[in-house]
């Protein structure tokens, strides 16, 4: 969830004007799409209708079900202190599989190629989530309990936003970024496949620890 937000912000930096003095960017459609996505991911609402990010929603849900969150909190604290991803990782106790997954994300960001970043965001993350989360929600609903309420809310918000809004927006964005450029579409396929392989490796590790 944390490194997903870094992908989102990388796209916002590339597709919008975040420098002073402000000037309009060329791609009006992608500018609007990424700002809509950032609004939902960074400033959604919790169950009490308080503004919050999906990262914070997820963290709260994990704490409610009794999952340990000390390592991610320490890592983010290190990021704030160092303002450097690699230094923060070196100072944190993070499972190797999670580090490999995040390293891939930041390698993608470091390409500085917006269509590649967008393809990993779209096909490696955003487009997968609704179908994946629907099955988890079905499973949780079979065993209802107050401890899972926050997690259910988080999952259902993602299903609603990603399935109905963010998913279609992301597909429209990648289509606009790649256009008729065959090389860019080849990049999109290659990096999307790599992203999916990285996700499978991470899930396999998580499965081995359960």
Give the positions of each predicted feature.
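Non-heme di-metal
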Residues: 2-210
């Amino acid at each position: 969830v944390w490194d997903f937000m870094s992908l989102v912000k990388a796209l916002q930096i590339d597709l919008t004007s975040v420098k002073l003095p402000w000037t309009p960017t060329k791609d009006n459609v992608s500018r609007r799409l990424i700002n809509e996505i950032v609004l939902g991911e960074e400033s959604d609402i919790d169950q009490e209708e308080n503004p919050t990010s999906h990262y914070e929603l997820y963290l709260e849900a994990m704490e409610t079900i009794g999952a340990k969150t000390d390592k991610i909190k320490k890592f983010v604290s290190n990021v704030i202190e160092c303002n450097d991803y690699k230094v923060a990782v070196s100072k944190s106790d993070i499972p190797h599989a999670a580090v490999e997954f995040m390293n891939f994300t930041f390698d993608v960001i470091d390409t500085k190629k917006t269509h590649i970043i967008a393809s990993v965001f779209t096909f490696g993350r955003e487009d997968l989530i609704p179908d994946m989360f629907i099955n988890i929600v079905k499973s949780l609903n079979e065993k209802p309990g107050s401890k899972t309420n926050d997690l259910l809310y988080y999952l259902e918000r993602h299903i609603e936003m990603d399935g109905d809004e963010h998913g279609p927006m992301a597909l429209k964005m990648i289509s606009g970024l790649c256009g008729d450029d065959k090389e860019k579409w080849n990049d999109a396929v290659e990096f999307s496949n790599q992203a999916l392989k990285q996700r499978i490796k991470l899930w396999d590790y998580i499965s081995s620890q359960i």
